[in-house]
Amino acid sequence: MKLKNIAKASLALGILTTGMITTTAQPVKASTLEVRSQATQDLSEYYNRPFFEYTNQSGYKEEGKVTFTPNYQLIDVTLTGNEKQNFGEDISNVDIFVVRENSDRSGNTASIGGITKTNGSNYIDKVKDVNLIITKNIDSVTSTSTSSTYTINKEEISLKELDFKLRKHLIDKHNLYKTEPKDSKIRITMKDGGFYTFELNKKLQTHRMGDVIDGRNIEKIEVNL
């Protein structure tokens, strides 16, 4: 066997048996070779998409969708949950949180949920700050925890907006989706003890994107990475 073929065979064997290539000249850290699943790559792509916020909008409802035209931009928002019953044909004084779901090149934007009532009171800067606690598991027995404030700007806020913005914060500041999220979760605890959970190994379920909670009653937000 030619030396060239021997080298190729040896290289292939090394990959099969060790799962990575090593070299004495320039060792490679295992972390740089970790392969993310397609599902995790898809989550990273989705939660890195641009989002758009529009306040005090009016629209009309037809066949399970609400059409808005902010700044002459056509936006169709699909209603998925309880908001189907909450809105009549003509809708006004609402805010919309938009993440584009369609991939075609048309000028129209399709989004899901994210409709809330416009604030009834005027606020200086924010509605409230809540405690954001982020715990990272180092190994099976060791973890680190940090605490900071998270600003809520709406009296009513959709689970879609909370989920999307929190994950974007974790992507930007804590490397979410650089590795597999496994059992990572976000937990939103309310003043009455109720809570909402976002599982970070999957996209927020479509039927929850239209659900709305009172931002003034959020007690704390906990993240386990």
Curated annotation (Swiss-Prot):
Residues 94-196 are annotated as: Sialyl Lewis X-binding. Pfam families: SSL_OB, Stap_Strp_tox_C. It is found in: Secreted. InterPro entries: Enterotoxin, SSL_OB, Staph/Strept_toxin_CS, Staph_exotoxin, SuperAg_toxin_C, Superantigen_bac, Toxin_b-grasp_Staph/Strep. PROSITE patterns: STAPH_STREP_TOXIN_2. The keyword Ribosomal protein does not apply. Transmembrane segments: none annotated. Gene3D superfamilies: 2.40.50.110, 3.10.20.120. One of its GO terms (cellular component) is extracellular region. Keywords: Secreted, Signal, Virulence. Secreted protein that plays a role in the inhibition of host immune system. Targets myeloid cells such as monocytes or granulocytes through binding with sialyllactosamine-containing glycoproteins. Prevents initial rolling of neutrophils toward the site of infection by interacting with host SELPLG. Disrupts neutrophil motility by induction of cell adhesion via interacting with glycans but independently of SELPLG. The C-terminal domain contains a V-shape binding site for sialyl Lewis X. This is Staphylococcal superantigen-like 11. It comes from Staphylococcus aureus (strain NCTC 8325 / PS 47). The gene is sl11.
